[in-house]
């Protein structure tokens, strides 16, 4: 008898009567199609709504479908005082935050902010100028 596994570890790698194979996610045509559909759905959700799912470097962050004209997505370092700086820039510009979420993963964080009105280029530039901000994107 032989033990077959696709999850190698030091214990089974050198064991007698053991066959260790690479783990092949999406190893059938059907699973490849399902993975492709999932990737397209998640990319579309990111582009249209700013939501992130299954990212390697960023946390899952989902505020649902964007129902406002002023959603802003901010990729930034996961450091103290970022949220208050975003709120200060927006408040100083007279922008009201109607909804917001912030999620972090390791060294990076992601903030989605729904505004009652779209942010103009001047506000976006001020957000981009905050130390630790990597990217600001107007979703809608």
Q: What are these language model-derived features?
A:
Residues 1-63, 110, 114, 140:
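Rossmann-like dinucleotide-binding domain for NAD(H)/NADP(H)
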Residues 53-140:
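A conserved regulatory-domain signal marking ACT and ACT-like small-molecule sensing domains
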């Amino acid at each position: 008898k032989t033990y077959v596994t696709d999850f190698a570890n030091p214990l089974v790698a050198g064991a007698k009567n053991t066959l260790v194979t690479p783990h092949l996610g999406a190893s059938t045509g059907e699973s490849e199609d399902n993975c492709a559909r999932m990737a397209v759905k998640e990319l579309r959700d990111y582009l249209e709504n700013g939501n992130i799912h299954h990212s390697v470097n960023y946390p899952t962050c989902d505020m649902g479908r964007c129902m406002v004209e002023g959603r802003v997505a901010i990729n930034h370092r996961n450091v103290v005082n970022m949220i208050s700086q975003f709120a200060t820039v927006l408040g100083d510009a007279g922008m009201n935050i109607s909804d917001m979420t912030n999620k972090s993963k390791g060294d990076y964080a992601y903030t989605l902010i729904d505004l009652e009105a779209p942010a103009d280029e001047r506000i976006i530039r001020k957000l981009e100028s905050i130390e630790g901000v990597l990217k600001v994107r107007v979703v809608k």
